[in-house]
Amino acid sequence: MAEKLMKYSEAVKEFDPVIGLETHVELSTRTKLFCPAPISFGAEPNTELTPVSLGLPGSLPVLNATAVDYAIKLGLALHCQINEWSQFSRKNYFYPDMPRDYQISQYDKPTNGEGYLDVELEDGSVFRVPIERAHIEDDAGKNTHVGGADGRIEGADHSLVDYNRAGVPLIEIVTKPITGVGDRGPEIAGAYMRAIRDIVRALNISHARMEQGNMRADVNVSLRRSPDDPFGTRSETKNVNSFRGIERTVQYEIRRQAAILNDGGEILQETRHWDEASQATAGGRVKSDADDYRYFPDPDLVMLHITPEHIERLKAEMPEMPRERRNRLKAEWKFSDVEMRDVINADALDLIEETVKLGASPAGAKKWWLGELSREANAKGISLEELPINAQEVADVEKLIAEGKLNDKLAKQTVALVLKGEGTPAEIVEKHGFKVVSDDGMLQTAVDEAMAANPDVVEKLRSGNMKPMGAIIGAVMRATKGQADAKAVTKIVMEKIKG
């Protein structure tokens, strides 16, 4: 039975939403957090294991120093307080995906303390998200429930467990309650998650592919009548693995909770799950006020000491952060705020930057990646990076246009053939005999014929109405099989109507 929902615009007028996000980022180290087991996506189940990752008696953990450095770099990017001393604790719980029956995490002494992240919204404004902590922990294995209708344990015939993921290093970034969001809660949550993805990719510490589980989020939502009231009871939607899913989870929970509260009901403190098919959250486990995981310091791991000198060395290795990079490129490329937001929303910044480095103009690179190629990617349901064309090939097409060897129509045909796998732009131009007709005599003849066939258009042009010019250019293009230079044709037409 569908849950009752309040209209979103009414819900955010009646209530003050409060959001919290717990983001799990899988680090791209070669080996696991506490053992030398390799890490690779898509490996055969239960093949990347050691006694430590299986929690076998007598096995002892050894901390991965690279994972610690990655965590510190992320802490620096999030303006966190880097704690000189931090500690690993055992988080005790029993579930089939946790072979040793406890997770090694950081409890009261995390590596990264309080910080913040400024995120840009669609209108160009900036919203500051407060960070509570960003701590290191190891991941659990992965359960696959077989026989159920939706892949969940309810109704499943049996379950399979793959421990390859057990022990993979994670950073969990926990926000403080995000207040003051008004009606922009979904947008702020999505912008924050995209900013986290961009940062960890810039730092080269995670692939951050949500579809592969490299990055996922638990989304907490609560409502209160007024910003002066105490926080309401929150729901926690677990393991949401897409940006759109996060945005829709926030919106759905605001609408669901508002309807309950408006009818005089109470919100259950529970874990929920986002169902992509129904575009709704579904109820799960009802939680007590606080889960008792019986944390205690892991006796097999000494406290982690991070010296100021080590922090300074890592600071010196920090790359340019995504927001600063976007602002720099926007100025260099002379893009407007709207143009730059279009580039970012299309996830085309890296591709355009690489294309420009290879010789294309910023405007030309943007034209291709946000035009023909974006339409092609959207039609196929894939990302721009997955298209069978690269920055070098786009830059080569732009070069051929600049050299007068291709016009817009021939360039589009060339790109279409590159996408079909027929070769490089140069090979395609040679193979198909593409060339721009620049012979003045041929163009003069084609223009004369087009003007003779369109006397009404010529009359309008002579009276100063330039809108019908396209009819003459189109006729010349047809006569030359699309190989005429449109600028040259326009010049000839203008000379003839003035003469």
From Swiss-Prot:
InterPro entries for this protein: Asn/Gln-tRNA_amidoTrfase_suB/E, Asn/Gln-tRNA_Trfase_suB/E_cat, Asn/Gln_amidotransferase, Asn/Gln_tRNA_amidoTrase-B-like, GatB, GatB_Yqey_C_2, Gln-tRNA_amidoTrfase_suB_CS, Gln_synth/guanido_kin_cat_dom
Reply yes or no: does the keyword Protein biosynthesis apply. yes
Reactions catalysed: L-glutamyl-tRNA(Gln) + L-glutamine + ATP + H2O = L-glutaminyl-tRNA(Gln) + L-glutamate + ADP + phosphate + H(+); L-aspartyl-tRNA(Asn) + L-glutamine + ATP + H2O = L-asparaginyl-tRNA(Asn) + L-glutamate + ADP + phosphate + 2 H(+)
Gene3D superfamilies named in the record: 1.10.10.410
Primary enzyme class:
ligase
Recorded GO terms, molecular function?
asparaginyl-tRNA synthase (glutamine-hydrolyzing) activity; ATP binding; glutaminyl-tRNA synthase (glutamine-hydrolyzing) activity
Q: Which family does it belong to?
A: Belongs to the GatB/GatE family. GatB subfamily.
Q: What does this protein do?
A: Allows the formation of correctly charged Asn-tRNA(Asn) or Gln-tRNA(Gln) through the transamidation of misacylated Asp-tRNA(Asn) or Glu-tRNA(Gln) in organisms which lack either or both of asparaginyl-tRNA or glutaminyl-tRNA synthetases. The reaction takes place in the presence of glutamine and ATP through an activated phospho-Asp-tRNA(Asn) or phospho-Glu-tRNA(Gln).
Can you name this protein?
Answer: Aspartyl/glutamyl-tRNA(Asn/Gln) amidotransferase subunit B
Q: Per UniProt, what is the name of the gene that codes for the protein in this document?
A: gatB
